A protein has these predicted regions:
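A local structural micro-motif
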Residues: 9, 47, 114-116
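Short, exposed beta-strand-loop hairpins at the edges of beta-sheets
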Residues: 132-151
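Assembly/interface hotspot detector across virion components, adhesins/toxins, and nucleic-acid enzymes
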Residues: 3, 15, 111, 115-121, ...
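Short, solvent-exposed mixed-charge patches
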Residues: 158-159
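Long, charged/polar, surface-exposed segments that mediate recognition or autoinhibition
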Residues: 67-127
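N-terminal leader/targeting segments
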Residues: 18-85
Length: 159
């Protein structure tokens, strides 16, 4: 029981102490291989991937249906996204280490605003994203961000 209580207090620290996703990590993603390298090195585990979509999660459940954070890559168009779950909790307990907020701040300060673009998915429906063109990015397209149901999403809109 004592070990369990220690684990409960240590879990948030362990979760947030991982090597977090950065703006520079995202700028380097130019294809499926670099996406996989990034998520694997950041500690993500493969979820229920298909031939067309690669799903990776942090803190992935045994049945691979739930995770604290998600990353997805669509093989048909090289679209990708990263989702940090429960921003309110992360902001409160991570002592300023909310990687979604850090990445959004860097996008807004170093990239050029493009426009608001809609992205539709079966999970979230239609969502408006603020998009930017980032010089030095290896991907072809616009990087967007939005908050959806309390989660922070960084999304590539490929050209």
């Amino acid at each position: 029981m004592k070990r369990f209580i220690i684990f409960l207090f240590a879990f948030p620290y362990i979760l947030f102490a991982q090597d977090q996703l950065t703006f520079n990590d995202i700028l380097k993603i130019k294809n499926q291989d670099i996406f996989l390298k990034t998520v694997i090195e950041k500690g993500y585990s493969e979820g229920n991937s298909t031939a067309n979509k690669l799903y990776y999660g942090l803190g992935l459940s045994k049945d691979k249906s739930e995770a604290t954070d998600w990353a997805e890559f669509t093989t048909l168009n090289s679209e990708f996204y990263f989702e940090q779950s429960n921003l309110e909790y992360v902001r409160k307990y991570s002592e300023g280490k909310c990687y979604y907020d850090q990445i959004v701040s860097e996008i807004k300060s170093t990239c050029e605003y493009n426009k608001v673009m809609k992205h539709s998915s079966s999970k979230n429906g239609s969502v408006n994203f603020t998009t930017y063109k980032c010089s030095g990015a290896k991907y072809k397209g616009y990087l967007g961000f939005a908050q959806v149901d309390g989660n922070g999403v960084i999304q590539l809109f490929p050209k």
